Amino acid sequence: MNRINQLFNSNKKDILSIYFCAGNPTLDGTVNVIRTLEKHGVSMIEVGIPFSDPMADGIVIQNAATQALRNGMSLKILFEQLRNIRQEVSIPLVFMGYLNPIMQFGFENFCRKCVECGIDGVIIPDLPFRDYQDHYRIIAERYGIKVIMLITPETSEERVREIDAHTDGFIYMVSSAATTGAQQDFNEQKRAYFKKIEDMNLRNPLMVGFGISNKATFQAACEHASGAIIGSRFVTLLEEEKDPEKAILKLKDALK
């Protein structure tokens, strides 16, 4: 069974997933960040593939991607860095990246390399669901790679149900149609959206992302989903502290 399915089948509550951009702040720090996050109780990790035009991301992750590319990070190097990662960590690892670099690498080759490294899934924010269905699903399923789809407050109920019926792993529930970035709290409109999706009783578990940065936002997300994904806040702390251990301890402190 895929590690993503194992995690959610365990009925674990308040799942914490952390995003960071591979190659930032240093080119060779990827494995150490992953190792450190697992050590400190993170349940799942999203490894960002840097891209020059990350349209769904706010300024923090845009800057991290720019720095990672300047440092020389590429998909080829990332796969080389992660080739023995399963000797060190056992939690689910998910790539998050845009379609362009993945297509340049070749989608089937990308899936093959994911299997070799023990990557469990991929989130591609700019991959339309229809394109996934028509062109990529058969390849991803052949290799056992979960393609995680995003939904937003603007996603129709019909499309949400369609995504739920034709994907596996979890559904990434974006807290707003805006870009990524830390928020202090969620307003009533966002909370109502979370509840509406929760009340649809979908087949797939839900994870909330975009804007999670503190106890209030983390708890609000976990109230209506299996857990939450934190990206921008951890990326900021990682750059400030220059040490993944200090960064994750500071973040976990903010979630208490």
UniProtKB/Swiss-Prot annotation:
Domain of life of the source: Bacteria
Pfam families in UniProt: Trp_syntA
Keywords assigned by UniProt, alphabetized: Amino-acid biosynthesis, Aromatic amino acid biosynthesis, Lyase, Tryptophan biosynthesis
SUPFAM superfamilies from the UniProt entry: Ribulose-phoshate binding barrel
PROSITE patterns: TRP_SYNTHASE_ALPHA (PS00167)
NCBIfam families: trpA (TIGR00262)
Free-text function comment from the UniProt entry: The alpha subunit is responsible for the aldol cleavage of indoleglycerol phosphate to indole and glyceraldehyde 3-phosphate.
Listed name of the protein: Tryptophan synthase alpha chain
Naturally occurring in which organism (per UniProt): Bacteroides thetaiotaomicron (strain ATCC 29148 / DSM 2079 / JCM 5827 / CCUG 10774 / NCTC 10582 / VPI-5482 / E50)
Name of the gene: trpA
